[in-house]
From Swiss-Prot:
Its EC number is 7.1.2.2. It is an enzyme of class 7 (translocase). It comes from Streptococcus pneumoniae serotype 19F (strain G54). ATP binds at residues 155-162. The keyword GTP-binding does not apply. This is ATP synthase subunit beta. Keywords: ATP synthesis, ATP-binding, Cell membrane, CF(1), Hydrogen ion transport, Ion transport, Membrane, Nucleotide-binding, Translocase, Transport. It is a peripheral membrane protein. NCBIfam families: atpD (TIGR01039). It is found in: Cell membrane. Produces ATP from ADP in the presence of a proton gradient across the membrane. The catalytic sites are hosted primarily by the beta subunits. F-type ATPases have 2 components, CF(1) - the catalytic core - and CF(0) - the membrane proton channel. CF(1) has five subunits: alpha(3), beta(3), gamma(1), delta(1), epsilon(1). CF(0) has three main subunits: a(1), b(2) and c(9-12). The alpha and beta chains form an alternating ring which encloses part of the gamma chain. CF(1) is attached to CF(0) by a central stalk formed by the gamma and epsilon chains, while a peripheral stalk is formed by the delta and b chains.
């Protein structure tokens, strides 16, 4: 183990000088320094640059308060390594793989893997385009997720991103026995805390590993925490052969942390002040999220769009990697339609006849056409009323409203708030239900019977209760 001494500390950046004859640490190696406090607190630094003459520049993963020039720094000889395997389920970690819940810490001999790895090679990748059934009608019908694909989840505050994420974790765990890894990147600590307790109450936590790099942490930790979560997910994929769900909230904050680190390292900023290495950093993360012949990692990434500008380099760079987009819309929340997924703005590469089948594709296309036409007619209805529409248009509007309500459903994880049991609807049931609505089979049933239900059988049962 070679050792050096701290030469200077500039916020989260620490320069370390290694004496002549000492082996210089490699880029991305973890260095360790112990503070002079009572607990001898360990601070981990990651090597970012070699400046020459035995000097390396590092980024701290924790606060550098208390570090002084001349302190001894040890090279661990390897990158940051985090615990992996079944023991991580139900636990909460930070970027270094240390547990931050109140339960017993991991033992020193627990299996660990480095957070820096190469993406799978071409011959390791799986070429099949298989749909990941979520049991959520609006997603499965109109913007299906691919196994091993990447989904962008766009939405403002209070439109149901967290509930949708929890429902996806619940459904994958219940129906597929799948594992989920939740990674909070630059999360508000309060939100992360709420999510942890909600997941504990709903029982989903047993199939989930959680990793947090909160908003108050140094940029190095926020930048690397996504890799920590991904490393845990990769182990389940490659060693256990599992289909894993990886949630990253928020991918924009990963970019933001990278921008801060880049400025601290003295790199010249690029467009809009972002780091010149933006596309490379995003690519290194995204290319590791994929399906191999052993298993898959499907990622659902919340993406904040600064000032609603989709041409901003941060969301624009993320877009290039996405297979599906799920857009949450505030207008649907106001109508009481949950999940508030916008059926016209959401899209998926998987919605193609060769992947989902001819019938599914045709039904989805017709649902979109009917909703689009209803959208166009809304101005006429608002100004002149329904009476000005032709009989054909009146029928279309009635069916569109039934479709809009049928796209909603009660979530299992929200049962404690709504008092209504949640539902999981297989894709075949979803397609059949919408096909029958489009064919006019249920034109005689009241609109309210379609709201917040699962399959079409639930609609019929609800209508009977209402006296129809």
């Amino acid at each position: 183990m070679s050792s050096g001494k701290i030469a200077q500390v500039i916020g989260p950046v620490v320069d370390v000088l290694f004496a002549a004859g000492e082996k210089l640490p490699e880029i991305n190696n973890a260095l360790v320094v112990y503070k002079n406090d009572e607990r001898k607190t360990k601070i981990v630094l990651e090597v970012a640059l070699e400046l020459g003459d035995g000097m390396v520049r590092t980024i701290a993963m924790e606060s550098t308060d208390g570090l002084t020039r001349g302190m001894e720094v040890l090279d661990t000889g390897r990158p940051i390594s985090v615990p992996v395997g079944k023991e991580t389920l139900g636990r909460v970690f930070n970027v270094l793989g240390d547990t931050i819940d109140l339960e017993a810490p991991f033992t020193e001999d627990a299996e660990r893997q480095p957070i820096h790895k190469k993406a799978p090679t071409f011959d390791e990748l799986s070429t099949s385009s298989e749909i990941l059934e979520t049991g959520i009608k609006v997603i499965d019908l109109l913007a299906p997720y691919l196994k091993g694909g990447k989904v962008g989840l766009f939405g403002g505050a209070g439109v149901g991103k967290t509930v949708l994420i929890q429902e996806l974790i619940h459904n994958i765990a219940q129906e597929h026995g799948g594992i989920s890894v939740f990674t909070g990147v630059g999360e508000r600590t309060r939100e992360g805390n709420d999510l942890y307790w909600e997941m504990k109450e709903s029982g989903v936590i047993e199939k989930t590993a959680m990793v947090f790099g909160q908003m108050n942490e140094p940029p190095g930790a926020r930048m690397r925490v996504a890799l920590t979560g991904l490393t845990i997910a990769e182990y389940f994929r490659d060693v256990e052969g599992q289909d894993v769900l990886l949630f990253i909230d928020n991918i924009f904050r990963f970019t933001q942390a990278g921008s801060e680190v880049s400025a601290l390292l003295g790199r010249m900023p690029s467009a809009v002040g972002y780091q010149p290495t933006l596309a490379t950093e995003m690519g290194q993360l995204q290319e590791r999220i994929t399906s191999t012949k052993k298993g898959s990692v499907t990622s659902i990434q919340a993406i904040y769009v600064p000032a609603d500008d989709y041409t901003d380099p941060a969301p624009a760079t993320a877009f290039a990697h996405l297979d599906s987009t799920t857009n949450l819309e505030r207008k649907l929340v106001q109508l009481g339609i949950y999940p508030a997924v916008d059926p016209l703005a959401s899209s998926s590469r998987a919605l193609a006849p060769e992947i989902v089948g001819e019938e599914h594709y045709a039904v989805a296309a017709e649902v979109k056409r009917v909703l689009q036409r209803y959208h166009e007619l809304q101005d006429i209805i608002a100004i002149l009323g329904m009476d000005e529409l032709s009989d054909e248009e009146k029928t279309l509007v009635a069916r569109a409203r039934r479709i809009q309500f049928f796209l909603s459903q009660n979530x299992n994880v929200a049962e404690q708030f709504t008092g209504q049991p949640g539902s999981y609807v297989p894709v075949a049931e979803t397609v059949r239900g919408f096909k029958e609505i489009l064919d006019g089979k249920y034109d005689h049933l009241p609109e309210d019977a379609f709201r917040g239900v699962g399959s079409i059988e639930d609609v019929i049962a609800k209508a009977e209760k209402m006296g129809f």
